[in-house]
């Protein structure tokens, strides 16, 4: 199980283990490196926390499963990749399944009523779609949730100190003095923060790497070449805090070219907020930026829900100017299209129009199935089905 620090990996996995070892002290790490096979000893399921600090543990697990295969025998957790990836001699395919854990969605933090089910939409259960005015949820609530994030300790904290908890997470994110991983120790924290800030300024856009590099140079009055940027980006990706969204290519039979540039996203929007020093009040004063930050939070929740159904979230954009914020594509071929808006009749109408254009183009010029549903996902407002068949629902009613 991989994911960013502070998202609850160890706490969750402790619920499923019958014995465990934590590689969180220098003594434990040294012993595991000297005798990685011994780390496997213990009642199964055996939890090995922060396995990447003794990477040969992975090889020992794989070898053990080659000769003594059982389902659910080991649980490995990690908040970064190994310092030296060459020490992992096998991908684990066919032996070890990888699970990505993110901070909590609103459904998981019990801040979504869950009356709108993506599973039901995929199954065509239109009669289960609610009509709900949803009057007790405001933009101010969304701004707060966005800045707080889905970090379990922040979620549990009283509202008046939850933002401070998230701030403390950001302040400690790039403290590597005691880190045994040279890849992180050799990075300058201030440069990592610069890149994350530039990334945050381009949140929910398809900004090219060259654009982000130029932003770093201009905003901080310093030089940065593409090689240095790529090196620092690898470190940020290894910390699981960035999560770009790749493009959907439905193989359209026309001269239309599908754009392949990924959309820039974070594993949790609160990281972007803290990087830029953005508060709930700031968001309320800049609705254009608020919309981009909200799109990022919505993508976080859609990813969590869609992956639990056996699928992934992609984006669509072609050279004809047609763009869709999120395409929810299941492994069985079913898909649904989602436009993400803060709310308001004009925005909802624009989102519905985009969705219907995409549906028409796919049905006319692609071998893809027709979409299971079209959904305008809003920050606030009610849930209902429009006369044209497009569903409208706020994020605080959504669940898998």
Task: Annotate each PLM feature.
Residues 125, 377-400:
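Domain-level recognition of nuclease-like catalytic cores that cleave nucleotide substrates
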Residues 155, 159-334:
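Accessory nucleic acid-recognition modules appended to NTPase machines
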Residues 12:
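Hydrophobic positions on the alpha1 helix immediately C-terminal to the Walker A/P-loop
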Residues 24, 336-346:
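Active-site ExK catalytic segment of metal-dependent nucleases
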Residues 67-88, 236:
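Sensor-1/coupling segment of RecA-like P-loop NTPase cores
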Residues 9:
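Conserved lysine of the Walker
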Residues 33-75:
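Conserved nucleotide-sensing/catalytic segment adjacent to the nucleotide-binding pocket
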Residues 86-205:
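Interdomain motor-coupling "hinge/lid" segment immediately C-terminal to the ATP-binding subdomain
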